[in-house]
Regions:
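A short amphipathic helical element positioned immediately N-terminal to and/or at the very start
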Residues: 3-12, 57-63, 67-71, 286-290
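Short membrane-interfacial helix/loop motifs at transmembrane-helix boundaries
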Residues: 30-72, 273
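N-terminal signal-anchor/first transmembrane alpha helix
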Residues: 1-41, 112-123, 166-169, 173
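Intrinsically disordered, low-complexity segments enriched in polar/charged residues with Gly/Pro
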Residues: 7-8, 37-38, 46-50, 211, ...
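Alpha-helical transmembrane segments of integral membrane proteins
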Residues: 68, 72-326
Length: 326
């Protein structure tokens, strides 16, 4: 019993330290432009190239082999990591949560009703090879959809294997290693922070989708869901207001892990010189610059230490309190 209490206390201390560390990194990242730094990030000081912290009086953590201030690079690199990994993780959680929740709730039983006008428009668009401007075609389809809905004639219902489609898309995305996929997309041209975040988010939704789908399958037949369905609510309302909020709970654990994975992936891309432009500060770019002069240990130690502690803190937040088996 005493050992279990000690384990829990140690776990609480680790979580507290992780939260304090992440909060400090986030605060410094947000305040980086307003901090009174001696030198801006990415601007070389050619008079002090690869100088150790003890030798460079104005560079508190020294300079890298390019003459850039290590401390400024760390702070603005934290800002880049925050502005990139957090929106990407939230986008992946949003897409995966909606896709996995819908797939788990409806399965392959979803049926979509197409009004008569829409059915006629689809048939005509697929069978007639007359070149029509996209805007005119879109306006025509919308008009026929509206007319068909008003007349309620020639309506058709088609089955939609939603679960199979979502799982096939997730499996196809997981077939290619994420690093290779992002490298292929990012290598087409220089991406901004927002562009790279969008690429990372669109290639990371499969994991959250599987978690939410599994949770949805376990709760879709619980009494409170059946009671909501028996009360006469529409399936979409039951899914949105009753089933989905409970199915999204696994994302509370998955989000820190996703942040850690995206942070490591972004640093890897920057280290390889793919992804962010060279003028955007990044911990990966700092490590890549330190390769030019390996004896400048401070240029390697500080970015690697900050990156490792940040990823470790995210992983600690996901650790659950478990008691040893008796």
């Amino acid at each position: 019993m005493e050992g279990l209490t000690t384990l829990i206390r140690n776990g609480n201390r680790r979580r507290t330290l992780a939260v304090v560390w992440l909060a400090g990194v986030a605060l410094l990242a947000l305040l980086a432009p307003a901090l009174p730094l001696p030198y801006p990030a990415g601007v070389p000081d050619l008079a002090h190239v690869a100088e150790a912290p003890a030798r460079a009086s104005h560079h508190w953590l020294g300079t890298d082999p390019q003459g850039c201030d290590v401390l400024s690079g760390l702070l603005f690199g934290a800002r880049t990591a925050l502005l990139l990994s957090l929106p990407a993780a939230l986008l992946a959680a949003l897409l995966g949560g909606l896709a996995g929740g819908a797939a788990g709730f409806w399965g392959n039983r979803l049926r979509m009703s197409i009004p008569g006008g829409g059915l006629v428009a689809i048939i005509v668009a697929r069978s007639v090879g007359v070149p029509v401007p996209a805007l005119a075609m879109g306006a025509g389809v919308l008009g026929m959809l509206w007319a068909g809905r008003r007349m309620r004639r020639l309506s058709a219902t088609i089955p939609v294997p939603l679960d199979s489609l979502v799982m096939a898309a997730a499996s196809s995305l997981d077939t290619v290693p994420r690093l290779v996929l992002v490298l292929a997309l990012a290598a087409r041209g220089g991406l901004s922070v927002a562009g790279l975040g969008l690429v990372l988010g669109l290639t990371s939704w499969s994991g959250p989708a599987r978690l939410v789908r599994a949770r949805m399958l376990s709760i879709s037949h619980l009494p409170f869901i059946e009671a909501a369905q028996a009360s006469g609510l529409s399936p979409a309302r039951v899914w949105w207001h009753h089933a989905l909020p409970h199915a999204l709970r696994p994302l509370q654990t998955a989000l820190p892990l996703s942040l850690a994975a995206l942070l490591a992936l972004e640093s890897t891309l920057s280290f390889l010189g793919v992804g962010l432009p060279p003028d955007v500060p990044s911990w990966g770019l700092q490590l890549a610059a330190a390769r030019q002069q390996p004896q400048a240990w401070w240029a390697i130690l500080f970015p690697a230490l900050i990156l490792s502690l940040t990823i470790l803190s995210f992983n600690i937040l996901t650790a659950k309190r478990t008691s040893p088996a008796v």
